[in-house]
């Protein structure tokens, strides 16, 4: 029974990292994932392979699962895994190799492992630079106050920027690093202005980027 599972916790080390990842991720999307993880922690089952997961963070997983259900978000193993881990940069790098995560999951975990974000003033700006999936995941992890912003990003697609390096060069900037710098300046101003498409507004933002 449970005692036998606890006694054989170290046997997990004999399993392949892929097997450990697959089993953990399968558990994380179960309806009672937080309860199951809490039981595993109480038995010391996870300690040999994932000592970073501690009982104090199980409540984060429970809250996230409740939020997913309330907001209509599908359970996601990587997002739920992030809820169990200490918030620090480089989570994907740290756990990607240990659990043989895919490049995509490693990048997602890196993004979600950053310190808890504040509620963004403009969720679309956050989504533009981090991607809609990451922005919505971070809002789910943030708490109930992120619901309106999360809803605003439903179906959101990253708009194409109306200016390219060619436009910068056509304005007299010598090809090279300066073009990229000016283009980045334009991009920041354009996104902050709500990604306008009209020629007058775009032209004014381009003028400002070249000033």
Positions of predicted regions on the chain:
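Residue-level recognition of alpha-helical structural elements
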Residues: 1, 124-125, 175, 198
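Conserved, hydrophobic alpha-helical core segments of structured domains
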Residues: 3-148
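Charged substrate- and nucleic-acid-binding regions of tRNA-handling and nucleotidyl-transfer enzymes
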Residues: 58, 135-211
